[in-house]
Amino acid sequence: MLMPRRVKHRKQHHPTRRGAAKGGTRLAFGDFGIQAVEAHYVTNRQIESARIAMTRHIKRGGKVWINIYPDRPLTKKPAETRMGSGKGSPEWWIANVKPGRVMFELSGVDETVAREAMRRAMHKLPMKCRFISREAGEF
């Protein structure tokens, strides 16, 4: 699982999900990618399950890059606790993904295999995404 080894502060404010991504909107490494269409939080488990779905489909060919990192803790209070008595304990690590952000990249396979691998990974993610490729000029 992706998570920071150590952090300065255990708990943070919730990140805002408004606005478009400022950087990371173009393909940097691979020939194909998954681009976010809407804003959402992506947990470290969702990132890992999307990575596994892609790598199992492409088998030994190709290389996968993960361009997002879950660096923010999201807290949760235990079930059936009364209000107050402080903030809950950190439960998940999340990456705040905004529209336009390229989350995963892939190269070394043909487009039909890449499209199917990315489709399987998109089903694991909590927001609408789109497939982009360098050849189509969508980078």
From Swiss-Prot:
UniProt-listed InterPro entries: Ribosomal_uL16, Ribosomal_uL16_bact-type, Ribosomal_uL16_CS, Ribosomal_uL16_dom, Ribosomal_uL16_sf
Xref: SUPFAM superfamilies: Ribosomal protein L16p/L10e
PROSITE patterns: RIBOSOMAL_L16_1, RIBOSOMAL_L16_2
HAMAP family with a match to the protein in the record: Ribosomal_uL16
UniProt keyword list: Ribonucleoprotein, Ribosomal protein, RNA-binding, rRNA-binding, tRNA-binding
Protein name: Large ribosomal subunit protein uL16
Subunit note: Part of the 50S ribosomal subunit.
CDD domains cross-referenced by the UniProt entry: Ribosomal_L16_L10e (cd01433)
Entry keyword DNA damage: no
Organism: Nocardioides sp. (strain ATCC BAA-499 / JS614)
GO cellular component, one term: cytosolic large ribosomal subunit
Any single biological process term in GO: translation
Stated family: Belongs to the universal ribosomal protein uL16 family.
